[in-house]
Design a protein with these regions (language model features):
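Aromatic-residue-lined binding/catalytic grooves and analogous aromatic/hydrophobic interfacial grooves
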Residues: 1-172
Length: 172
């Protein structure tokens, strides 16, 4: 009621101050969900490292050369689909050798199975009072192998792979 009163009086500063206390402790607006780690397992120094962002196509690109092979990662996020896609390519067939893992700065568990990583957890605070999440990372590859261990997917001899990352939370 006090926030509404402040808004009707056009006292936006007071309304903003009051809304900070609505949900209580550990209910920050934005908390980190997960971190996708892609660790290149190839030999050699990185050269021609480049990052680009195209606002027109909503595409972020990272590229580098290592031992004469050009590697590229293209990142695309779709808000309607609640999905992030990352395409890994190389200028030489079967040149992608990397480890992909998930971690988070908030309480979580990670499980690897087949070509998929699943991370579950909850926002800071007591689990029974916090927002819970489940995110799935799935990889589609053309060739090579993907081997899961406890919490990592190992890609070996892959020419191209697309990583799909989706998320769902208990937030209403």
């Amino acid at each position: 009621p006090k926030i509404r009163e402040a808004l009707f009086k056009e006292d936006y500063k007071a309304a903003d101050s009051l809304q900070l206390h609505v949900q209580g402790h550990n209910s920050e607006y934005y908390q980190p969900l997960a971190i996708i780690n892609i660790k290149d397992r190839n030999e050699g120094a990185y050269t021609q490292y480049q990052r680009q962002l195209s606002l027109d196509s909503a595409l972020a690109t990272l590229s580098y050369t290592r031992d004469g092979i050009k590697y590229q990662r293209e990142y695309f996020a779709s808000h309607p689909d609640q999905m992030i896609a990352i395409r890994l390519t190389a200028s030489k067939k079967k040149a992608i050798n990397c480890d992909i893992s998930l971690t988070s700065l908030i309480p979580h568990q990670v499980k690897a199975s087949g070509k998929q990583l699943t991370i579950t957890g909850h926002a800071m605070g007591k689990p029974e009072n916090s927002t819970h999440f489940c995110s799935i990372l799935n990889i589609k590859n053309q060739d090579g192998t993907i081997t899961p261990t406890d919490s990592t997917l190992h890609l070996k001899g892959v020419s191209e792979a697309v990583i799909y990352f989706v998320n769902e939370t208990s937030y209403n």
